[in-house]
Amino acid sequence: MIIYDKPFKTYEQQIELLRTRNLNISNQEFAIHALDTISYYDLINRYQKHFIPDGEHFIEGTTIEQLYSLSMFDRSIQAFILKYSMFIENIFKTKLAYTLSRDFGVDMSVYLAKSKYKESYQNPNNVLTFDAVQLECFKTRNDDKIANNPTLYYREHHNHIPPWILLKNLSFSNSINLFKLLKNAQRDDVVNELLPNEPDRIIPLNDKTNFIICALEAIRVFRNAAAHNLDFTALRTDETRKIPSSTLSKCLPGKILIKKEKKKIEKNEKVYLKGVYGVMLSMMVLLKTDYLKKQFIVDFLSVFNGIDEGDREIRPFLFQCYANIADMPVDTRNRFLIYLEQT
C-alpha cells in the first residue's frame, strides 16, 4: 500500500499544521476563508522565500492575514500585467498584420506562402520551422474548435481571411513565431515600427530585433503565468532568453528606472530585469508614446491605493515583501514617481 507523502487534509487540519509551523492564526473562521478561496499552496508555498527562510517555520509574528493581503496584492499586480500584455499583443499584431497585408496582400494562400518566409529559425533550445507555424495558422482557420470570431465569421461570410483577421485568433506565441520567420525586409520593418530610432538614440538593427523577440517572449510567458495562476513571483527569464539590459537602458535613458554606476548597469539591476520588473520596463518601451507610458505608471501606482486607510497603510509593507520574493527594486514606486515628474 502506498503511503502518500502529500495526503488530503481538511481545512481544520491545514490550520493545525500551519500553527505547528509558527503561523499566527487567531481567527479560525478567517483562516478557513483564506484557505477556501486562495488555497494552501498559493497562500503558503508561493511566498515562503520571504516568510519561511529556513523552509520549515514562519518568521516570528507572521499572520495569516498578512499572507492573505499579500496574495491579493500579488493578484493586483498580475491583473496589471495581464492588462498591458494584451495591449502589447494587440500593438504587435497590428504592426505585423499591416506589414503582411502591405507587402504580400490579403489572400491567405499568398501571405502564408512558403516562399515569403525563412525555412527555419534557431531558438535557444530548438529549431522553429515555417511548416510547423504555417500548420498552426491553417488550424486556426479551419478547425471549428479553434477558429472563433472574427476568423470563423470571415470564413463563412467573406471570400478571404486577411492577416488582421487571422491574427486576432492566432495565439500570441504563434504570432511571435511567424514574425521570427519573416525574411529580413519584412521583419526589419516590423522591428523599426515597434522600436523606431530617435535623434538621440540610434540602436543597431540586430540589437533591436533581439530585444523585440526577447521582450515579446518574456511578456507572453509572464502573461500566461498570470492568466493560469502559476507561480508568477518565482518566474524569471533564463540566460538564453533574458531581456538585453543594455538595449533596454538605451530605450529608457537616465538613471531613474535602471540604476547605473560609472555608466555601467549595476549587478542588482540585472537581477531585477530578469523578473517582472524587466517585463514592466519592456512594456513601457513598446508602448512608445509618453502618454501611454504615463498611463502605464499611473495604473501600476494604483495598486498601492487600497480600499481604506488601514489597507493603504499596509501596502508599502506588502510591496517590500513582494519585492523580496519577485526580485523587484524596493524603491520601484519612487522610481516611477520620479520618472513621471521628469517626463
Model-derived segments and their meaning:
Residues 2-342:
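Long, contiguous internal "core" modules enriched in hydrophobic/ aromatic residues
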